[in-house]
Design a protein with these regions (language model features):
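Short, well-ordered beta-strand segments in beta-rich or mixed alpha/beta enzyme
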Residues: 1-25, 63-73, 106-141
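Glycine-rich beta-strand-turn "strand-cap" elements at beta-sheet edges
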Residues: 1-4, 28-65, 102-119, 142-169
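Well-ordered, non-membrane alpha-helical segments in soluble/globular domains
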Residues: 26-30, 84-91, 139-140
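Short amphipathic alpha-helical segments
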Residues: 77-103
Length: 169
């Protein structure tokens, strides 16, 4: 469904919206024709605002590749999903960041957007390292009964691998 992602990070929703407007205003002032051409080429989009619930390593450079899992969840049980990630999965992800297998990981909650209610991300140096780490995560999850509980709360998802082409802290 998606082929490109553009995102902004900030310490609050107000700061996020201010940063997004500033970037948009600068792009329009610099080259309206180029912005129009970009809009013609990438002529549809979905807007989401996410809030970080848990994660590690997101305050520094994330590496060259990201694996994102966009979850459709039972809204009444989202808090339970958050608690599971923090208690059952965060220690594994944190260790993978400490060991260098991952550059970062994150678990985010939906603030604004469409059907996806939670977003899990992992990043690594490159796609090969990312997929190796992802395989280790899947193997660990298959042995963890709490992973099946998470699957009952968030029973549908879409997976994307992103090559990070440009990132400014």
């Amino acid at each position: 469904q998606w082929r490109r992602v553009q995102y902004f990070r900030a310490g609050s929703i107000d700061a996020l919206l201010t940063a997004q407007k500033k970037v948009g205003d600068q792009a329009d002032a610099k080259n309206r024709k180029l912005a129009t051409e970009f809009g013609r080429i990438c002529n549809s989009h979905d807007d989401y605002i996410w809030r970080a619930v848990a994660g590690k390593g997101n305050e520094r450079a994330r590496g060259g590749a990201s694996f994102s899992v966009y979850y459709v969840c039972d809204q009444a049980r989202e808090g339970e999903a958050d608690a599971l990630v923090k208690s059952a999965f965060a220690p594994m992800y944190d260790q993978m960041v400490a060991d260098g297998a991952l550059k970062s990981w994150g678990w985010n909650e939906h603030v604004v957007g469409a059907q996806y209610r939670r977003l899990a991300t992992i990043t690594a140096t490159d796609v090969a390292s990312l997929m190796k780490a992802r395989s280790a995560i899947v193997a660990a999850m298959e042995k963890n009964p709490l992973a099946r509980t998470l699957d009952t709360i968030c029973d549908s998802h879409a997976d994307y691998i992103w090559e990070i082409r440009s990132e400014v802290p």
